[in-house]
């Protein structure tokens, strides 16, 4: 069965394989898609294997916060590289 998550994972994998370091902007886009790919995978694992609702909610919040922090780090990296 094809779901939205299945489709997004495949599209992200396609974009990652097509943007092998063409330039720095494409590298940042590739890393952004990688973050999305990892987040979707970890959300699926959390939903499948964590059965306590409070722990599941806490892990999903931590996952979202960590994805935001990682993307902020990539943005900082991009700004530093772009200015050199």
From Swiss-Prot:
<keyword id="KW-0496">Mitochondrion</keyword>
<dbReference type="GO" id="GO:0006099">
    <property type="term" value="P:tricarboxylic acid cycle"/>
</dbReference>
<keyword id="KW-0479">Metal-binding</keyword>
<feature type="transmembrane region" description="Helical">
    <location>
        <begin position="4"/>
        <end position="24"/>
    </location>
</feature>
<feature type="binding site" description="axial binding residue">
    <location>
        <position position="37"/>
    </location>
    <ligand>
        <name>heme</name>
    </ligand>
</feature>
<dbReference type="GO" id="GO:0046872">
    <property type="term" value="F:metal ion binding"/>
</dbReference>
<comment type="subunit">
    <text>Part of an enzyme complex containing four subunits: a flavoprotein, an iron-sulfur protein, plus two membrane-anchoring proteins.</text>
</comment>
<comment type="pathway">
    <text>Carbohydrate metabolism; tricarboxylic acid cycle.</text>
</comment>
<feature type="transmembrane region" description="Helical">
    <location>
        <begin position="32"/>
        <end position="52"/>
    </location>
</feature>
<keyword id="KW-0999">Mitochondrion inner membrane</keyword>
<keyword id="KW-1133">Transmembrane helix</keyword>
<feature type="topological domain" description="Mitochondrial matrix">
    <location>
        <begin position="1"/>
        <end position="3"/>
    </location>
</feature>
<keyword id="KW-0472">Membrane</keyword>
<dbReference type="InterPro" id="IPR034804">
    <property type="entry name" value="SQR/QFR_C/D"/>
</dbReference>
<feature type="transmembrane region" description="Helical">
    <location>
        <begin position="59"/>
        <end position="81"/>
    </location>
</feature>
<feature type="topological domain" description="Mitochondrial intermembrane">
    <location>
        <begin position="25"/>
        <end position="31"/>
    </location>
</feature>
<keyword id="KW-0349">Heme</keyword>
<keyword id="KW-0249">Electron transport</keyword>
<feature type="topological domain" description="Mitochondrial matrix">
    <location>
        <begin position="53"/>
        <end position="58"/>
    </location>
</feature>
<protein>
    <recommendedName>
        <fullName>Succinate dehydrogenase membrane anchor subunit</fullName>
    </recommendedName>
</protein>
<feature type="binding site">
    <location>
        <position position="49"/>
    </location>
    <ligand>
        <name>a ubiquinone</name>
    </ligand>
</feature>
<keyword id="KW-0816">Tricarboxylic acid cycle</keyword>
<comment type="function">
    <text>Membrane-anchoring subunit of succinate dehydrogenase (SDH).</text>
</comment>
<keyword id="KW-0813">Transport</keyword>
<keyword id="KW-0812">Transmembrane</keyword>
<feature type="topological domain" description="Mitochondrial intermembrane">
    <location>
        <begin position="82"/>
        <end position="84"/>
    </location>
</feature>
<keyword id="KW-0408">Iron</keyword>
<dbReference type="GO" id="GO:0005743">
    <property type="term" value="C:mitochondrial inner membrane"/>
</dbReference>
